[in-house]
């Protein structure tokens, strides 16, 4: 089939209600007080998307945003998917980075793609589940546009997947709060139109 085009808009959640320097990933942190202002900016960025399929991480910093954006775009409902959750930092969740022994953190940062924090998951684990979601989305919803509200780790993994980048390189991609990244799939070819807008 020719001419089938699908746009996938990856939206990072807005600023979370957490102090600077705190390690968080899978912890279900709420949105910050700036949510309404950030939401207004995002609504402008995505106003042109008509009735997309909307998917979200189940964490409230994403699902709250997804519900608002879905209503704004006349989307029927939001489908949450656990595979869109942020990296699980295990025992480090909600600890100050400064309080985690430096040697342990350095060991992890040297190979955080394959190494997992204690009782957490590695970036390869995250990439595996994000890729699985992406492949399903492409095959099941061909030709439909999708809005995916998720986390920086997942967005970087999906950009890596779309561009065939090594995961270590993907970690250099800047993904700001409330930013939009657009992936186009046309006639089976995947391209990244823009990142972090």
What are these regions (language model features)?
Residues 68, 157-161:
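Active-site signature of alpha/beta-hydrolase-fold catalytic machinery across serine-
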Residues 41-105:
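Phosphate-coordination/substrate-recognition cap region in phosphate-metabolizing enzymes
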Residues 10-65, 117-131:
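Loop-to-helix element that buttresses phosphate recognition and phosphoryl-transfer chemistry
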Residues 8, 52, 144-153:
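Generic beta-sheet signal
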Residues 2-6, 75, 79, 87-99, ...:
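Acidic, low-complexity terminal tails and accessory targeting/binding regions
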Residues 5-14, 100-107:
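Short coil-to-beta-strand
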Residues 16, 154-155:
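Short active-site segment of divalent metal-dependent hydrolases/proteases
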């Amino acid at each position: 089939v020719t001419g089938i085009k699908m746009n996938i808009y990856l939206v990072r959640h807005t600023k979370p209600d957490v102090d600077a320097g705190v390690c968080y990933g899978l912890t279900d942190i709420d949105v910050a007080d700036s949510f309404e202002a950030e939401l207004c900016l995002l609504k402008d960025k995505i106003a042109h998307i008509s009735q997309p399929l909307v998917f979200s991480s189940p964490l409230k910093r994403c699902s709250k945003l997804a519900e608002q954006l879905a209503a704004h775009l006349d989307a029927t409902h939001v489908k949450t998917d656990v595979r869109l959750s942020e990296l699980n930092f295990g025992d480090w969740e909600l600890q100050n980075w400064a309080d985690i022994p430096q040697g342990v953190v350095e060991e992890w940062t040297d190979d955080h793609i394959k190494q997992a924090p204690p009782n957490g998951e590695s970036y390869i684990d995250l990439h595996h589940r994000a890729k699985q979601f992406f492949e399903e989305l492409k095959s099941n919803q061909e030709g439909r546009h999708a809005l995916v509200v998720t986390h920086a780790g997942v967005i970087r993994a999906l950009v890596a997947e779309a561009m065939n980048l090594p995961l270590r390189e993907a970690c250099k991609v800047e993904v700001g709060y409330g930013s939009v990244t657009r992936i186009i799939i046309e006639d089976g070819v995947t391209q990244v139109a823009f990142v972090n807008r």
